[in-house]
Amino acid sequence: ISSATTSSGTFSGTLAGSGTLDISGQATQYLQTGNKDYDLAVRDGGVLVLKGTADAPTLNYNSITAGNNGTLRIEATGDAQGSANTTLNVENITFQNGSTTELIYNFNQDAPFGAPMLTAGTITVQDGAGFLLSNMKGNAAMNAGSDLHDVVLMSATGSISGLEDGQSLAARISGLFAVYYQDATLSRDGNDILLNATLRQENLFASAADTWNSAAGAGLLWEARKNLDPDSQLAQFMNGVSTMINDGNLSGASRAMAAAAGSTVNALGTAQRDALRDQMGWIRNRTTLMGVNPAY
């Protein structure tokens, strides 16, 4: 499947027989069904999204190759309460130099890191392969009370090559991951590839603030991160700004934070004005009923 212009499609039917799907160009292909006799490949600008369903969160394939300038995304089945992460089972998978693999979790469940997202017979990680960890866009809260330590992301029943035992590589993070954590790494421990990350100490949003208003918005988001109502618009907004920063859209993040700060100031002004109106009404009523003290 190749496209010279931007295109996107979703397939949720049945993959019959056996075969190979090769995604390239500007095509984005969603697959919501699996077949252990199929080989998948994505390269040269293509995006392949593997996304299970509520009824079938596990997808099975024979082999997957994430090629140069290709993006492989393993995305949770949804962002609702209890929606499972997608689990991928393959005979072998190869992450080539120049590829990007995105692991997208649903944090709106009790144990988002309870099981690996990928299990394979063999895993090959070439030098220069990139990895990104993020969450569903609809997520607005993350239980981030401590460092992430030895979270199993991938597991091999056979062997892992290209990443030596004990060796680690830096991973990119975005969304709520980047709000609460920093210094994410993937490392090999025997037949597992583990995630480790430390709680973020510096204000993520400050790096994109280039005006007084955007700096005020950055401070607002940073201070509010642990006291947000998951259903609030501010929580959704924080997730979006974090993603913009990760994508390099610092000017967009700055404008968004400035708007947030301005909205907050306006809201406070409105609240003060309404409170003053109420107080003046109470004074008027008291004066009407009881008169005015002659001393005044």
Stretches found by the model and what they are:
Residues I1-G13:
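GD-rich hexapeptide-repeat beta-solenoids
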Residues S2-T5, T53-A54, A76-G78, N196-L204:
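Secondary-structure transition/turn motif
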Residues F11, L15, T101-L103, L195:
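Bulky hydrophobic/aromatic "packing anchor" residues in well-ordered structure
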Residues G17, L21-G25, Y30, N35-D39, ...:
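Extracellular beta-strand/loop-rich repeat segments of large surface/secreted proteins
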Residues M136-Y296:
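Outer-membrane translocation/initiation segment of Type V secreted surface proteins
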